[in-house]
């Protein structure tokens, strides 16, 4: 699927993009140009449709990586006197805590193992033990292991207890079903360079309109103030500060391809096929996934590193990279692992080819897996 000699990025973002998406960045756009502003509006409208949020939600785009959007959402939506429950089963959950610490917002950490999904019962127990909790910051797909946390059950318990739910859907948006009509979710955060198969550089937050309109002056940051961004864009149709024009154009093209493929169901099905092909081929080489199948998301798979003394990730990475595939280092704290992504403009055959390249690298380096 990839022309030329570009490497295949088996990472959770940036990821391999289609030629059409790259070609969309060949045109320059004026940041105040009416055509560009219409494109931004269309992109936001399409993002809302993916999660069925057209009626009660708004989509606010923001320059920068997904973490910029996460910090913007927390700073804009959580009052200074609020208290945020953070279920923590990985590095990206821990990042939420670091953001809250920097902003001086109170939080309660729900500590979980790196292979343990959060449960609605555990969240409800935290509500019962800590009445001061006002918000929950929940990572839908913890990319450090590829762990899928439940969403609908968490949303239901938050709604039942009157808690505001902010969801980091960075690595699930577009690949896994999310339906805002079911209720319980106040904000949803993602970015251009993940499962939508755009390029990095634009985050976005989908929020209940009523909550955003009540958040004026709350953000401690000028650049990350989503209320200010929303009001300015409504008034002028323009971004407050220089927009990532080429990123928006690439996302526009990527969304067109997303729709032509069949939307979220088709995108998710392709990624599931990719994941199944990868896991099967890697098991044949002797590798074992870190997660159980029932909690494995079809986005990135974490594998246990070989125990062979000849194993060194840097040398292994370089050998696989030489064959045209870029892997991802492990991000777990307890065991040595590495990760292989299943997403991007690739199919199951590409994952089988990648596994073959991994097998050749093991032979070349004299590494025994079993």
From Swiss-Prot:
Cofactor(s) annotated in UniProt: pyridoxal 5'-phosphate
Enzyme class, spelled out: transferase
Reactions mediated catalytically: (2-aminoethyl)phosphonate + pyruvate = phosphonoacetaldehyde + L-alanine
Subunit structure: Homodimer.
Name of the protein in its database record: 2-aminoethylphosphonate--pyruvate transaminase 2
Organism lineage: Bacteria, Pseudomonadati, Pseudomonadota, Betaproteobacteria, Burkholderiales
PANTHER family cross-referenced by the UniProt entry: 2-AMINOETHYLPHOSPHONATE--PYRUVATE TRANSAMINASE (PTHR42778:SF1)
InterPro entries the record matches: Aminotrans_V_dom (IPR000192), NH2EtPonate_pyrv_transaminase (IPR012703), PyrdxlP-dep_Trfase (IPR015424), PyrdxlP-dep_Trfase_major (IPR015421), PyrdxlP-dep_Trfase_small (IPR015422), SP_NH2Trfase/AEP_transaminase (IPR024169)
Function: Involved in phosphonate degradation.
Keywords: Aminotransferase, Pyridoxal phosphate, Pyruvate, Transferase
GO molecular function, one term: 2-aminoethylphosphonate-pyruvate transaminase activity
Gene that this sequence comes from: phnW2
Highest taxon of the lineage: Bacteria
UniProt EC number: 2.6.1.37
SUPFAM superfamilies, per the entry: PLP-dependent transferases (SSF53383)
N6-(pyridoxal phosphate)lysine modification, residue list: 194
Family: Belongs to the class-V pyridoxal-phosphate-dependent aminotransferase family. PhnW subfamily.
GO BP term, pick one: organic phosphonate catabolic process
Pfam annotation, one family: Aminotran_5
